[in-house]
Amino acid sequence: MTLNNYYDLAIIGGGASGLTAGITAGRSGMNTVILERLSRTGKKILATGNGRCNLSNNNITLADCETSLNSETVSKVLESFGNAEHFFRSLGLICRTDESGRIYPYSLNATAVLDALRLEISRLGVEETVDFKVTAIRKENGKFAVISEDGRKVIAENIIVTAGGCSGQSMGTDGQFFDVLRKLGHSVTPLKPALCPIKSNSPFLKSLKGLRVHANVSLLDSEKKIIASENGEVQFGEDVLSGICIFNLASKAEKGMIVSLNLMPEYSVQQVNRLIRHFQKLRSDTVAENLLTGILNKRIAQIILKECDIPLSKNVSEISVKQLNLLTEKLGNWTFEVSDKAAEWKNSQVTKGGISGTETDEFLQSTKIKGLSFAGEIIDINWKCGGYNLHWAWASAQYAVKSIKKHQKGD
């Protein structure tokens, strides 16, 4: 069954990118349909930012992403879109910005974002076809035929794929569409969970579960070389390290690497050592368990003392210089070996990998199939935590549609 005789544009995937593409196409007068595999568009938007929808970040730069796309292309996308608040104000949604540059809907409710997007889709007359799981794309009489699992067919002059990656599988992004694109001759770079916890087999994590600590966090390779660093709050789970700073390192983490926490980054090694020696004199008549009181959470302090082989019941005055030096080192380099990333896709916020940037041109169009474009997470690009990935979703979708329209005009 054919839903309509012909569309200027078929958008595959009704998430953040798909809805933005639909709005941009509708505003430019294109006859457009959004094809969504779930029973409703935009479901994943509701889960972003813990339900508050961190929709952008004022500090976004090219340095905040990992990608195989040409850097000039990414820069053009960001420059073309500009400030996300302007786009959302055009939808009737006002925003607020926190001290870190993270942009949220003023209501701090993700539903407001989705409602604004869908209201504009409706106003523009853009069709939304749900429960349409695309299983094949082929050419018929020079046009694209998009085929659903149940045999329905949509004919379109152009296609934008906004089907997402593999993260958030309960919300429609299970990576299935990469198989469709592979059959069309496209390459997919290795797919890995990103913005997710990092697993460790440290025997102490179970005792640390539920605690948080502020630290400078570094990811080290097998030669102890720093791969990347972040600063922020680390959350301890039963077998994982979590928190935004950990999420931002996860895409680079591999089994056998080391996560190093500097628990006192504002102090030099010498300053930490002098401070501990001062505390030893100050608390010489008490036990080691109390040595780090005033510096660290008690449970964290106990674990670190144990790792330094300092019995908690040992008199502080009896702690040796060697043990104090080891403790100093541990406070600046508390290590956890990576056993694996928390590899279930359900625990990741975005996907590392996707359609290779070498197979998309400067307009986010396929270099293999004329009329096929990509936007959002389907492309091999992932951004750090804090609204950056959603910014890319909006920006790349708008850019891809504008590029199609530009080429239609022959510019």
Language model feature labels by segment:
Residues N50-T97:
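Glycine-rich active-site loop/strand segments that organize a redox cofactor
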Residues A10-I12, L35, V134, K153-S170, ...:
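Short hydrophobic core segments
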